[in-house]
Amino acid sequence: MPTIFIVYNLKRETNAEEYEHYLAKTKIPAMRESWFIKDFKTWKIDKVLAPVVSESEGKLPTEPPYHYVAKIEVVDLNAMVGFLGTEGGKQFLKSWSVYIDPTTIFTLGHEM
């Protein structure tokens, strides 16, 4: 099953509480109601925890490079891409784009 991971930050001027309200009331319900999405979850990253390698080079950053991670399990990727090309899909992305930094990255992967 295709899985999309999105790592992102909010725009500097975005109020985190306002964004979390948007997530809870608009984005999460809309994503979970879409027939082409099996599951959708978002995590807020709290802090840098530890190095991944036993002997890291240099000092760990004090702030995570991204503060949010979303995971979308997609039943039909073509249907999702098709929806995003519609007026409704464009409006949905536009409503999210108000909050997120333009360095947002979408990645596509699969379970191993």
Kindly give the residue locations of the regions a language model identified:
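Macromolecular interaction modules
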Residues: 1-112
